[in-house]
Structure formats: C-alpha cells, structure tokens
Amino acid sequence: MKWVKHGKESAGAEETARWMAAAVTAFAMTVMAVTLPGCGGPPTGVTPPEPPLKPPADTSMAPVGGAYHVHPGEDIQQALEAAATTGPKRVIVHAGTYAPRQPAQAMVWFNKHHDGITLEAEGEVILTAANPALADQSKRGYPAIVNHVVYFGDGISGKTTLRGFTITGANGFVTQDEKPVDIQPPIEAPKLEKGKFFYTDGGGIKIFGRSYPVIESVTVTDNFVSPCGAGISVEHRGYSDGSRLQSVQLRHCIFRNNRCPVSGSAVDLLHGSGAEIVNCLFIGNLSNEPMDDMAVTPGKWRPTHGSSALTLFPGSHVLVRRCTFTGNRNAIDDASSGNIYEQSIFWQNTAPGGWPPGGRYELDVASGIGVTGCFIRGEINDLRKSIDSERNVIGCDDPRFDAHFVPQAPGFESAGYRPVSGPAAVK
C-alpha cells in the first residue's frame, strides 16, 4: 500500500509544501507492526495493571436503566454496537482498566453507524493501548497492541460524546491490517483516502474525516507516537469551516506527559482541521523528541525552535479559551491566521531536551490578533512578536499554581484551567 498525501493545497507557504511533499515521496514502505524494529521507548508513566480478559459475552446484551453497562473484562465495543443498532444510545463503563482484546488499529471505534452515542465512565476508568499478555516484546510499540485507543471516523457529529475516561498506553504501535476489524469503512468523499497519518498519529484519540465529537472531562496521558499527535490527532482534511458544527469540542480535559518526535504532542490539528478547546490543562507534553525511522518523513517541522504541545497546520481553526499550558516543550505553534486564544495562561513551557537548536517559546502564532486576555511568560514569550501587549499580560507574574494548577496569585481569577466535577458546566 502506498501512503497518500493530503492537505489543503492552497494553504501554507513553500516550507509547508516541501515538508508535505517529503512526507509522501520519502516514505515508500508499507508499515506493519510485525516487521518494523525499534520503538520510541516505553510510556513514561505508570503502566496500567494487566486487566482480566474474558471471552466476549453473548450478543444479546440488554440495557439496564436506559443504558448499556460494561464491567471489567467485558467488551466496550460490543456495547457500542448494541447501542447503535437497537438503542438506547448511552453506554456506561464501570470502574476498572480495559485493554485491547487483539492487535488492531483501535481498541474502541466510532463511525457513522455510532453517531449520537454517549460513552461515559463511571468511577475511575482507564482505557489503555497496552496488553502485555498479547503483545510481542520484540516488536515496535510493546506493550501496546493498537494504533489508537479511541477512533472517531467519518460521519460523527456533535451528538456523540466521550466523557470521563483516562486514555493511555499508546507506544508507537502501527498496523494497517483491517482484520479482525475495519475501523473505517470506505468513504464516498474526495480527499479522504487513508494516508500515513491515519495510521501513525493519534495514539490516544484519532479523529478522521467529517468527524466532530464532544470529548469531555477526559485525561489523555503518557502516550507516545511517531511522528505526530501523541494525545489527539485531528485530520479533517479541509472538512472544517471553523464553526462549532465542524469542530471537535474538547472540554475540561487534561493532557499530560504525551510525547512525539515532531508536532502536537498533546493535540495536533493537521491541515484543514478544527477544534474548540475550553478549560483544558496541558502539562509536561513533549514534542521534538528524538527523531526515529517513522519521523524521517515528514521530518522536522519548525526546524529552529521546534513544535509544541498544540500544533495547527495551515488552514486549521481553533478557539482556545480558559486553558493553562505549563511545563511543556513549547506551548502553541499555529501556522494559520484568525484563530482565537482567550483568557489562557502560558507559563514556563520550557521543558529541556529535544532536537531543536533554538530557545523555548510560549506562542508561535502567524497572527496574534485573536490573542486576548492571556497571561504569558517563558524563555521566549512571543516568537513572532505578533501579540498585542495592551490586550494581554506579557511577562506576567508567577500565577502560583496549587496542586490542581489553579492560580492563587491575584489577577488570574478569570484566566486558565479550573477542575470541574460531574457533567461539564463551562460551554
């Protein structure tokens, strides 16, 4: 199979065109997890315990109290199929750790058939890409056995919600095998053929095509992929106009300790993608990790200062409101214009290491006109000097974060992330 190049061809400068062209022409091999040597290294956090595995329950799963219920050792995907086929469109996953049942492209997947379902956690629920009992220790990505923990495919609207989970364990495993399951049936639309980034990016969550889910109160932590988008990869391929209807909604989420060699270690918005990110915390996410064979193409995006926790490629749209970025290896790089960053804190995103020769930055935005009410301080506050210092506090005082990263210093009352409990309150 040959990797396919996709992007918004009219967007971006010559640097972008050269970078994307290299991603296609230099990557002529087929990626199969069973044949590629090497690995990006084990996840940096605590490896979740090996969960008990049971044979799938019989297919006569029945709802109780207006929802399908899944307990440890049972099959989340089976409940999603039942909800999609007969309803009700609510699946509750009870406390425990859930791992993949077989090597595949994803552990849990949604496509058009599943639109309108709410999948939510009750108690502490960990979804992990790792299953040491089934993984081959000699292969790339061990102990992960799926490309993506959760996949949202073409045909998903804002009526579909993922809520309350911890998503972890991705480690650079890649397979193109569409058996035992094909997570994305053929799409009758231009520009939506599967390319390299469909398989490699989005270790925690991959969002592809005309897909605009709501992701709420989810912690995405300790994922590694190569080359890009360890936490969440959004690949709308131009099917986003920046409106709420055509944007992924990320609310009250935490992105922590996700790593990749190139761009968007926490969230990566590929060409022509869209997201609204409200009340989220980004901490300890590391782009620009050591380059490996998978990252040779596309190569080093932003070769002097590197990429960041949140990356936007040309033609992508974002609204970032009341978020906190701290301790990342750079905060935001945005190659588009007209994007909005409001009431957010960018504090000391100066994590050491990585391949870029240049200094660390807080914001590298092509247009700073949409940056308002933000508090910014790091090694380089405003890489392009595009941000209005009268509408933001550049070189701000220490926000004095508490253990939950809530600022305690005066003046920060309306800025940055705040923990929430229960259903989302901030819209």
Regions found by a protein language model. Name each.
Residues 60-94, 99-100, 109, 416-425:
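Acidic Gly/Asp/Thr-rich repetitive segments characteristic of extracellular carbohydrate-active
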Residues 1-19:
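N-terminal secretory signal peptides that target proteins for export/translocation
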Residues 37-38:
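C-terminal motif of bacterial Sec signal peptides marking the signal peptidase cleavage site
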Residues 107, 147-149, 173-174, 195, ...:
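Structural detector of coil-to-beta-strand junctions
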Residues 77, 81-86, 99-118, 126-163, ...:
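Extracellular beta-strand-rich solenoid/capping regions of secreted or surface-exposed proteins
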Residues 121-124, 159-171, 193, 211-226, ...:
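Right-handed parallel beta-helix
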Residues 93, 100, 110, 121, ...:
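Extracellular beta-strand solenoids
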Residues 45-66, 132-136, 140, 144, ...:
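Acidic, glycine- and Ser/Thr-rich low-complexity intrinsically disordered tracts
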